[in-house]
Amino acid sequence: MMMDEDVEQASLMSFNDRPRAFPNMRSKTYSPLIFRIIRKLNVRVLSIILLFCFGAIFYMGASTSPIIVFVFTVCIISFLLSIYLTKWVLAKDEGPPEMVEISDAIRDGAEGFFRTQYSTISKMAILLAFVILCIYLFRSLTPQQEAAGLGRAMSAYITVAAFLLGALCSGIAGYVGMWVSVRANVRVSSAARRSAREALQIAVRAGGFSALVVVGMAVIGIAILYSTFYVWLGVGSPGSMNVTDLPLLLVGYGFGASFVALFAQLGGGIYTKGADVGADLVGKVEQGIPEDDPRNPAVIADLVGDNVGDCAARGADLFESIAAEIISAMILGGTMAKKCKIEDPSGFILFPLVVHSFDLIISSIGILSIKGTRDASVKSPVEDPMAVLQKGYSLTIILAVITFGASTRWLLYTEQAPSAWFNFALCGLVGIITAYIFVWISKYYTDYKHEPVRTLALASSTGHGTNIIAGVSLGLESTALPVLTISVAIISAYWLGNTSGLVDENGIPTGGLFGTAVATMGMLSTAAYVLTMDMFGPIADNAGGIVEMSQQPESVREITDLLDAVGNTTKATTKGFAIGSAALASFLLFSAYMDEVSAFANVSFKEVDIAIPEVFVGGLLGAMLIFLFSAWACAAVGRTAQEVVNEVRRQFIERPGIMEYKEKPDYSRCVAIVASAALREMIKPGALAIASPIVVGLVFRILGYYTGQPLLGAKVVASMLMFATVCGILMALFLNTAGGAWDNAKKYIETGALGGKGSEAHKAAVTGDTVGDPFKDTAGPSIHVLIKMLATITLVMAPVFL
């Protein structure tokens, strides 16, 4: 798509003569305690502390493996690059004062909610850490842990420390996503007055900063834990723990990351969609005013929600995905290396860390490939922003194929099976292709350039009911291709792994599960660039809101509308990517759970027979959990939206001058209502997700004790996990795609199709968009986290079920 001259070269004229309805709400910027402490330190003291920390990290890495040193080096370089991207973005101008005022209010709202939300989450995390400590002090140990002298107390402290570190890193990942978004949005708005390309580049680099930090922290956090435990426990020395058993000590890290990600996604999703739905129902439908109009009392809450829901929550979500995938792959790699009696198993265990280190390198190249702004005096059309992002993604994919092949040859070559590395390289290629197909499928079903969304828009012309029917049917249909893709990927990767030539002492092939692990790594090998595209969406959305509220020329709004439409598509495609990776990661975690049960029970645990009534009931409970969780998440958005609607209606009735710009809306009141409701509503579905597998496992463990079935608790939980994963994948695909399609059908009509804004088709499309909001931004993304968190909970609690 090409943009016209008047879109590319927007007017810079001042609009100060237009009426405004916006108060200056700026207050002191919030930052977490750890950052405030660092700021107060003397520069020399801080430098010495950093040098000491880096020295300690590299010492532990050198004492562990040269591979860990490579991982540490890449992560630190990526952090330095992210600092460069931050400075580059913050060096851009913020535009006129009216833009800055709006941006400041959004920043205040986002940081205020973040502070309250994460304070609540941290208290719950500390309480859960205490529960885990008590449970682990009375749990059983694996024979290998007992032989290595690892007592219950030591095991408990290690798991709790890993849990708290995972929770902390996940929280920081969320904060980083929000921090950059609330500072980049106004700079994108300002750049849109000059050039669409400049606005695009700022949004991409801001998203890139967050992505590199999130992925880098996931990798370096696990690497630090691994090397610390390796040195501390004397792994590899006579009488100590075997290196192949070490990854089991890391499961707490994945659980901590999942715990924070779930509540971040729930709270952020309820906030953003409660505000969005409430603002749309009264503003667009009842009052007939445009989106992001300054007369709407809920508009600031809506814009704040983009940051806490789409940026902070998505950062924590992908952090958790990567952490869970790395840990499960390390467990499976260690198990396979032990079965095959590979002389140096470190390559198979540390392979996931190296893959994601290369991810940081190639994604950085992809981000920097989005070239700078042309001279503003050059009046020529530019490429479609989606095409620009797609070129960067294609470059990243090509580099991923090359680096993945090099990584497999470097780390997975073994004399026992000289060609095994090539089979695993093909497994990685399967994962990379799967990721690309998932992105394409999501784009096809949610981009208004393609038939499905246009058909949905056409259905809007005959009323609200036909819009809803068409959207639901589109969402249901959209599950078919992804499921077929996942099925082919799992079977292909398993077959390639099984035929790699790696066999156990009985000559039985053992590489199948590790092959699926490698495919999952391949799918996530471009995660940093995918997260960049995801972060681009809410930044562009916020920029459009700032432009609308500051009443900039229509040509500027056209640029931000275009970026916003592309952002909607990238958000939808990255959600497809996220659920695909969650599906493969959950399969890995399920396999890792079975390996862990085998290790603790000291008996083979390879099959789950659903013909056993209790096991079948566990599966039913898992499927039910997905539906009940989704219902509670959507209902939470509905209740929050009702509070917002009542407040906005009250303000319009009591302050009739708002519509004529004679009175200012009370924006802060809506922000407070949404924040309070989101924090209140996130507890119930979150508690359901955490308590369900633990309660089910304990109940059936007791039942198994009295019926002479010692592994019944573990089997029922395995069945619950299996069914919940299958139902969760399908439900998330339906919710994400239907919601994204409804949103872009509305955007398509707003471009002028089928009567444009204000038409009957547009009103029906707004209804569909309203229904789709909690689907795609609350329930759907939360299910991504839920199915992985169920797996990490079972990994941590597996000894309790025996």
Curated annotation (Swiss-Prot):
Membrane topology note: Multi-pass membrane protein
Molecular functions per Gene Ontology: diphosphate hydrolysis-driven proton transmembrane transporter activity; inorganic diphosphate phosphatase activity; metal ion binding
State which Enzyme Commission number(s) the record gives: 7.1.3.1
What Pfam families does UniProt report for this protein, alphabetically?
Answer: H_PPase
Specify where it is mainly localized.
Golgi
- Does Metal-binding show up as a keyword for this record? yes
Protein activity control:
Activated by Mg(+) but not by K(+). Inhibited by Ca(2+).
Binding site residues for substrate: 273, 776
Residues engaged in binding Mg(2+) 3: 306, 541
Transmembrane stretches in the record are: 45-65, 66-86, 118-138, 160-180, 206-226, 246-266, 348-368, 386-406, 421-441, 468-488, 511-531, 577-597, 615-635, 686-706, 716-736, 782-802
- This protein's source sits in the domain of life called Eukaryota
Q: Which UniProt keywords apply?
A: Golgi apparatus, Hydrogen ion transport, Ion transport, Magnesium, Membrane, Metal-binding, Translocase, Transmembrane, Transmembrane helix, Transport
For Mg(2+) 2, which residues are the binding ones?
A: 276, 773
Specify which residues bind Mg(2+) 1 according to the UniProt entry for this protein: 276, 280
**Localisation:** Golgi apparatus membrane
Give yes or no: UniProt keyword RNA-binding: no
Per the record, the similarity remark reads: Belongs to the H(+)-translocating pyrophosphatase (TC 3.A.10) family. K(+)-insensitive subfamily.
The entry describes its oligomerization and partners as: Monomer.
What is the official name of this protein in its record? Pyrophosphate-energized membrane proton pump 2
What is the protein's species of origin?
A: Arabidopsis thaliana
